[in-house]
């Protein structure tokens, strides 16, 4: 008999809670995503996360300890060697990744682009981090006139290739992206995904078409999600979860436009009758505020998210479990624009916890979540991770 019929896992993308013991190896000494935001805001107002026990993990400005937290609380340390979204999420579901995905804040190495030019017969322009719309404004006309490929990246581990559909036919663009995917399987160039970014229109009025295609990497092994799906449990992926695992172990995928849309979809799944896992990623914290080093916007987004939690609490049933965590840090007052190597919070709550919660031992790997989910549903345990299911008392 499953202890919990439904587990709702929420990943607050990039919401770290202080430098990890190995932060120095990543250039991240002193990073502290929530702590620095709380200082910048002169106190974060997150009363619902505080009730669950956020301030019991660590007190921060505006976030204090409570006498009787509703949930169990601790922090988790990442075991894998990367600090990107895919590594964090794959570890959460029981994998250990010893090859970090590469990011290219200065653009891609010349050797890689030379090889891509040689294999595709087309010249490459761009080669820098940029927003898709900005790079089209800047280089779209040149691309049309020369037939070159616009190659660009972002703060994430991606290689994107943009071309006008009337200049480089879709079939050719997709073939080019497959070549780029092959080349970036090399460890030193390993990106999480290659993305075809076709566009149409005239200079000054370019638009990206829906013919985007992603060439992702499948997880390097089976995850707890695969085990759940193969045992006929539901795995409802909300936000970019399905993309992160390249659809592996997903039974239903719900796209989201924003954090608030993500919370709406979470409430929708709370209203659904299912047995298994609902897995939500809230990406705005990372994409809109962390990489852009905007502590004010980040703080406001955290407060908006917190204000939605009562709707979630209200709909949770006695045999539901809510797990809230993060996948890495992205301290908006830290130097650079990259993720930061931090501990992440872990909060666990069910309405059946009548006595309230208490501190759990520090988790040595994010995979403890996957192990807990696996044990609850009686599926094969991941190779990594220690379940804390039996420590959650009703």
Swiss-Prot record:
The keyword Metal-binding applies. It comes from the Bacteria. NCBIfam families: deoB, PRK05362.1. It is found in: Cytoplasm. This is Phosphopentomutase. InterPro entries: Alkaline_phosphatase_core_sf, DeoB, Metalloenzyme, Phosphopentomutase_DeoB_cap_sf. One of its GO terms (biological process) is metabolic compound salvage. Pathway: Carbohydrate degradation; 2-deoxy-D-ribose 1-phosphate degradation; D-glyceraldehyde 3-phosphate and acetaldehyde from 2-deoxy-alpha-D-ribose 1-phosphate: step 1/2. The lineage of its organism: Bacteria, Bacillati, Bacillota, Bacilli, Bacillales. Its EC number is 5.4.2.7.
């Amino acid at each position: 008999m499953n202890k919990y019929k439904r587990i709702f896992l929420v990943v607050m993308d990039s919401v770290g809670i202080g430098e990890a013991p190995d932060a120095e190896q990543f250039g991240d000494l002193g990073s502290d995503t929530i702590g620095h935001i709380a200082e910048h805001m002169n106190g974060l107002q997150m009363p619902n996360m505080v009730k669950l026990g956020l301030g019991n993990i660590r007190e921060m400005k505006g976030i204090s300890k409570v006498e009787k937290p509703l949930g169990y609380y601790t922090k988790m340390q990442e075991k894998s060697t990367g600090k990107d979204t895919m590594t964090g999420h794959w570890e959460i579901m029981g994998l250990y990744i010893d090859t970090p995905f590469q990011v290219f804040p200065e653009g891609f190495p010349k050797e890689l682009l030379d090889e891509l030019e040689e294999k595709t017969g087309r010249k490459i322009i761009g080669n820098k981090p940029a927003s898709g719309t900005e790079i089209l404004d800047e280089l779209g006309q040149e691309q049309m006139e020369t037939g070159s490929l616009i190659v660009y990246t972002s703060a994430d581990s991606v290689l994107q290739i943009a071309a006008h559909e009337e200049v480089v036919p879709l079939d050719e663009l997709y073939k080019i992206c497959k070549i780029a995917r092959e080349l970036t399987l090399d460890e030193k160039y390993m990106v999480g995904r290659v993305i075809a970014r076709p566009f149409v229109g005239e200079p000054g009025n370019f638009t990206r078409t829906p013919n985007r295609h992603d060439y992702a990497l499948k997880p390097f092994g089976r995850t707890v999600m695969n085990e759940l799906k193969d045992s006929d449990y539901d795995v409802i992926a909300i936000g970019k979860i399905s993309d992160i695992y390249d659809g592996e172990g997903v039974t239903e995928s719900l796209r989201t436009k924003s954090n608030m849309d993500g919370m709406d979809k979470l409430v929708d799944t709370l209203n659904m009758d299912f047995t298994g896992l609902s897995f939500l990623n809230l990406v705005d914290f990372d994409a809109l505020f962390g990489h852009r080093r905007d502590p004010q916007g980040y703080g406001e987004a955290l407060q908006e998210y917190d204000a939605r939690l009562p709707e979630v609490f209200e709909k949770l049933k006695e045999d539901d479990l809510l797990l809230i965590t993060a996948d890495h840090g992205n301290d908006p007052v830290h130097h650079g624009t990259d993720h930061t190597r931090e501990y992440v919070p872990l909060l666990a709550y069910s309405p059946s916890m009548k006595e309230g919660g208490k501190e759990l031992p520090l988790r040595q790997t994010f995979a403890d979540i996957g192990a807990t989910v696996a044990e609850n549903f009686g599926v094969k345990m991941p190779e990594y991770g220690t379940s804390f299911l039996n420590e959650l008392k009703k």
